[in-house]
Regions:
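ATP/NTP-dependent adenylation/nucleotidyl-transfer catalytic domains that generate, transfer
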Residues: 2-42, 59-62, 68-70, 74-107, ...
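Conserved G/P- and acidic residue-centered "switch" motifs that form tight phosphate/ATP-binding loops
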Residues: 50
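Short glycine-rich or small-residue beta-strand-to-loop segments that form or flank ligand, phosphate
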Residues: 44-47
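Catalytic nucleophile loop
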Residues: 53
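Catalytic-core regions of hydrolytic enzymes
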Residues: 130
Length: 285
């Protein structure tokens, strides 16, 4: 075992069977309690064919009963691989939940027709994510169910989601689990291998792969994020000159196999995107 592997294991909470069971029970209880306390009839979940939504649907069905979970499969035929649509459909059938499949190309085209043209694929991708959010909340109101988001701790700490898009949700049951742990939980829940073995992607543009985009594998990425939190807790920011550069230097020493540009990129995302997970500032009178 390499020093690098030892470091990752120390930084992350790799979970054994009993710990995964405790996580499962905790999330199931959380969903059940929140849905009951808010007086709603169940949950609406976007089912993408990816690992996060698969775990979310499985846990929601366990918590609420499959009859109280409604799945929405919202592909964009310009971007979404047909394998994702098939995997999402088969998962809903396997879990015996009601679902609808709605291609979002038509509303996307409607927006593009009236908006200024742009080649910026991030803007186009965010538009797609927000169209999905609108559909999710339409059915949330129609069915009197809560929208369960599928964002994990890695995405939340990086801000790797669309504000008021896939980040728009009533509950975030996976929000305290790093992506590495979501993979573990998926295997624990016997999520089909064609989903657990799939390369993660937000599907904001064709060919997008999360790890390739960020330049870091999930175990290392999660290790970096956890280390950033530890470094922030260990210092008094008022007494440390150029804190950002100090933390980047410490991260480079802790993760020598990762190039400095990738470390800077991860750190920059985690700092710049904090606004995504905090409420908009209110002017107090």
């Amino acid at each position: 075992m390499t020093i690098q592997t030892n470091l990752i294991e120390n930084l992350l909470f790799f979970l054994n069977y009993m710990e995964l069971e405790a996580v499962r029970k905790s999330i199931v209880s959380f969903i059940k309690t929140e849905v009951h306390n808010r007086g709603t009839t169940g949950a609406v979940i976007g089912v993408s064919g990816g690992i996060d939504s698969a775990v979310m649907v499985a846990l929601a069905a366990e918590a609420l009963g499959n009859e109280h979970v409604f799945g929405l499969i919202l592909p964009d035929s310009d971007i979404t691989p047909i394998s994702d649509v098939i995997d999402a459909t088969n998962l809903c059938i396997k879990l015996n939940i009601e679902f609808r499949k709605i291609y979002i190309n038509e509303p996307k085209a409607g927006f593009q027709k009236i908006l200024d043209e742009t080649e910026n694929r991030l803007l186009q991708g965010n538009l797609v994510a927000r169209i999905r959010m609108c559909i999710m909340y339409y059915y949330s109101g129609l069915l009197k169910k809560l929208v369960l988001g599928t964002s994990n701790k890695t995405e939340l700490e990086l801000g790797y989601f669309t504000k008021y898009g896939d980040g728009g949700a009533d509950l975030l049951p996976l929000g305290d689990l790093y992506k590495t742990n979501v993979f573990e939980l998926a295997r624990h829940l016997n999520i089909p291998e064609n989903i657990t073995n799939k390369k993660s992607s937000a599907r904001l543009w064709p060919g997008q792969v999360t790890e390739e985009e960020l330049g870091v594998s999930f175990p290392l990425l999660d290790g970096i994020l956890k280390r950033i939190n530890e470094l922030y807790c260990a210092v008094d920011s008022k007494k440390v000159y150029d804190l950002d550069e100090k933390i980047i230097k410490d991260l480079a020493e802790d993760f020598p196999s990762i190039d400095l540009d990738s470390i800077r990129g991860v750190y920059k995302l985690s700092r710049l995107n904090r606004h995504k997970v905090t409420p908009p500032p209110v002017c107090k009178f």
